[in-house]
Amino acid sequence: MATLFVENLTVADFSYLHPKRGMVGESWLVDLELTGDLDHQGMVFDFGHIKKRIKQIIDDSVDHRLLVPVDSEHATVSERDNNTSLEWLYRGGTIRMVAPSESLLLMNGPEISKANLTLFLMDLVQQVVPDNVAEVRIVLREEDTGTAPFYHYSHGLKKHDGNCQRIAHGHRSGIHIFENGRRSRYWEKLWADRWEDIYLGTEEDLEGTYYIEEIPHHRFRYDAPQGHFELVIPEDHCYLVDTDTTVEQLAGHIAEQLAAEAPGKHFRVRAFEGIGKGAIAEAGENMPGKTHSGWLSGAAVI
């Protein structure tokens, strides 16, 4: 038998529910190995088919969804007419969500982990590979950012035509901040702490704030092409902006906030959206009241 491998086959950008942290945005790289007999072409499986079939099935099942461990004592889930209602009780408060069922992945087990998601994906992939493939191996891993700060955020983009419109999906994202041309770990750490396990909400989508068990919670709701979305989440796990939460606008927001917090200085922000892609914005002394945003992309598969 022979084994072929594909590193960085795709990036799974999603959010999941945690009993202590609440809603957590995540980005995991997916590596794949297939072991089996060679076919008539002398291959285990054509690389072109891997990208078409296997990448697609992984993206369709996990990417831009909220992963829910339905066997957890923290979860209450019901489904009706292609919509799912969810309540998640955790240390920080209560998360409630109503959304089209396709925007969630309900997983067996008491928690979401690399181990159980890996098994889930291997079972899916096994269904689409040819009979000569005897073994499927998948590795899920975070991007290696060294000591550079990063944050986990969740959000939804109601105006997006694709799956970004889903109200609870997320990313694990790095941030690079340059103050007067020099990289500043101080500001990077400040924003990484500020947006740790955060939900980034648009003020326009905020219906109101009310108390559950004496804890203030925000309620967001909107209609999008895929259907109606509602989310209730503790106020102190939210950060509100007056724009949509696209990475271009988030980069601009961070740059403008930095310029306001440190007058007289110039800032350049590279804000990532998951792995290998993001936006650049500048603000400060050389361009008062303005930001310049642009898209950045790395070598990772997106």
Region spans (language model):
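Charge-rich, low-complexity N-terminal segments
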Residues: 1-302
